[in-house]
């Protein structure tokens, strides 16, 4: 049984937990305290508000313990705001959070709430079926290091990438009925 934590401080927590509960041999867990970090096999940092999540990571003394676990190889997946939390650099924001993934992210790259959109894509590495994507005030990656694999582009922007044990997506798979990305992440563990 794989115990996958969802950072339970702010954002789309229950939606990720619900998706994980539908995958065999996965035990979903809402992670809130640093003492729980060593009890999980992987972690999802959900979409929400990156500034609030970053502040709460600091307030709950989670930043350094999470950074240590991720750097030691624990699989982690950041969706939307979670992508920003993982990024080493953010083009339009001086704040930094975990700084573990060799990507440069444009915060709110797709614009404001009114610019939110949905689309469907094919991505054989993740699913043989079309995958629905939901973008809400979404960031995108403007630059990756050579050790980062670009998984998906939408409108020529990088919206999904992977670096070893780290996965980052601009969109919200937890807001669709599709389990493809959650299964893909579970297979990384």
Swiss-Prot record:
Pathway it works in: Cofactor biosynthesis; pyridoxal 5'-phosphate biosynthesis
Organism: Ruminiclostridium cellulolyticum (strain ATCC 35319 / DSM 5812 / JCM 6584 / H10)
Active site: residue positions: 80 (nucleophile), 172 (charge relay system), 174 (charge relay system)
CDD domains listed in its UniProt record: GATase1_PB
Signal peptide, first to last residue: none
GO molecular function: glutaminase activity; pyridoxal 5'-phosphate synthase (glutamine hydrolysing) activity
Keywords linked to the UniProt accession: Glutamine amidotransferase, Hydrolase, Lyase, Pyridoxal phosphate
Record PROSITE patterns: PDXT_SNO_1, PDXT_SNO_2
Protein's recorded name: Pyridoxal 5'-phosphate synthase subunit PdxT
Recorded GO CC terms: cytosol; glutaminase complex
Disulfide bonds listed in the record: none
Annotated L-glutamine binding sites: 48-50, 107, 136-137
SUPFAM superfamilies, per database record: Class I glutamine amidotransferase-like (SSF52317)
Organism domain of life: Bacteria
Purpose of the protein: Catalyzes the hydrolysis of glutamine to glutamate and ammonia as part of the biosynthesis of pyridoxal 5'-phosphate. The resulting ammonia molecule is channeled to the active site of PdxS.
BP-aspect Gene Ontology terms: glutamine catabolic process; pyridoxal phosphate biosynthetic process; pyridoxine metabolic process
Matches recorded under HAMAP family: PdxT
Documented EC number(s): 4.3.3.6, 3.5.1.2
